């Protein structure tokens, strides 16, 4: 039997569109063991809409890895514990992919390194800023160069908490991507480039007072505001209530605030109240940055 724990992730971190992501201490668990017949058992907080057959993304990812290494696809039973909210911008798809790949690799004898698994994960997912932190942990920088991914950990365990405010509605990545413009101005490109550099500096050297400016964005948050009522106001409310920085998590609708532990409660309540004023109910998760990434447990 093999069990793997996979963290949630927050991608597009601040200005780091499609390149910066963060692993969070909210986990899905994949368990695989030999069986007489194929079956999938689902458990956890979020099971609705998760396929319990061979179309399941965890299983498809497993088969992808086994085929890549020439390992005969076995007859197994899977137990999938789903605690990451799906279609909310917290990396549920990446967790399924990475969890399936890591579990399949371990089941086959651990023949691939994490860097090799990362390449397969990116080919399946297409967004390295989600799969890299899910696999490696911490805050990661990931870029695609000539069809391969280069990923490095910017900081494995920053000394702040991550407050994820999760509105009670689904938002698909495809719908959220469709509102983005085909091109941007030079001014907006420079704005994001400079703040991405500032964000990396703030994280590496733990200069958290720089996060307020370092997490500002012009490439996707304003464009997606129409899909998340109260987004702009809630991002500002987080800062006004004492957060170091705030951003849309992934493609949304989850909103992320980086906070000190002693300010977490007041920031959380202010953000939930802000969304409520726009007719949305939301659940707050107070999380730490996961430093390990996907792990066999």
Curated annotation (Swiss-Prot):
Top-level EC class: transferase
PANTHER family linked: HOMOSERINE KINASE, HOMOSERINE/4-DIPHOSPHOCYTIDYL-2-C-METHYL-D-ERYTHRITOL KINASE
The EC number(s) this enzyme carries: 2.7.1.39
Example of a GO MF term: ATP binding
List of residues binding ATP: 85-95
Protein known as: Homoserine kinase
Its job: Catalyzes the ATP-dependent phosphorylation of L-homoserine to L-homoserine phosphate.
Keyword Cytoplasm in annotation: yes
Underlying gene: thrB
Keyword set includes Amino-acid biosynthesis: yes
Catalytic activities: L-homoserine + ATP = O-phospho-L-homoserine + ADP + H(+)
Cellular compartments annotated: Cytoplasm
Pathway terms, separated by semicolons: Amino-acid biosynthesis; L-threonine biosynthesis; L-threonine from L-aspartate: step 4/5
HAMAP family: Homoser_kinase
Keyword annotations from UniProtKB, A to Z: Amino-acid biosynthesis, ATP-binding, Cytoplasm, Kinase, Nucleotide-binding, Threonine biosynthesis, Transferase
Family that this chain belongs to: Belongs to the GHMP kinase family. Homoserine kinase subfamily.
GO cellular component: cytoplasm
Any Gene Ontology biological process: threonine biosynthetic process
Pfam families: GHMP_kinases_C (PF08544), GHMP_kinases_N (PF00288)
Domain of life: Bacteria
């Amino acid at each position: 039997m093999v069990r793997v724990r996979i963290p949630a992730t927050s991608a597009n971190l601040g200005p780091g569109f499609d390149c910066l992501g963060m692993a969070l201490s909210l986990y899905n668990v994949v368990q695989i063991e030999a069986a007489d017949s194929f079956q999938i058992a689902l458990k956890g907080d979020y099971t609705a809409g998760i396929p319990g057959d061979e179309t399941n993304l965890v299983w498809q990812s497993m088969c992808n890895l086994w085929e890549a290494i020439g390992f005969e696809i076995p007859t197994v039973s899977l137990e999938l514990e789903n605690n990451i909210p799906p279609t909310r911008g917290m990396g549920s798809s990446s967790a399924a992919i990475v969890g399936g790949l890591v579990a399949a690799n371990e089941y086959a004898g651990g023949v691939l390194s994490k860097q090799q698994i990362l390449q397969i994960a990116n080919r399946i997912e297409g967004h390295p800023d989600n799969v890299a932190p899910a696999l490696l942990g911490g805050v990661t920088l990931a870029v695609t160069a000539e069809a391969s991914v280069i990923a490095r950990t910017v900081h494995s365990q920053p000394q702040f908490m991550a407050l994820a405010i999760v509105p009670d509605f689904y938002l698909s990545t495809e719908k959220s991507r469709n509102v983005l413009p085909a091109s941007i101005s030079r001014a907006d490109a420079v704005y994001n480039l400079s703040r991405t550099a500032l964000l990396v500096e703030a994280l590496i050297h733990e200069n958290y007072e720089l996060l307020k400016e370092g997490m500002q964005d012009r490439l996707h948050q304003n464009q997606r505001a129409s899909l998340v009522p109260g987004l702009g106001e809630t991002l500002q409310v987080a800062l006004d209530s004492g957060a170091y920085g705030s951003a849309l998590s992934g493609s949304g609708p989850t909103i992320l605030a980086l906070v000190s532990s002693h300010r977490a409660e007041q920031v959380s309540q202010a953000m939930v109240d802000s969304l409520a004023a726009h007719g949305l109910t939301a659940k707050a998760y107070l999380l730490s940055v996961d430093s390990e990434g996907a792990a066999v447990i």
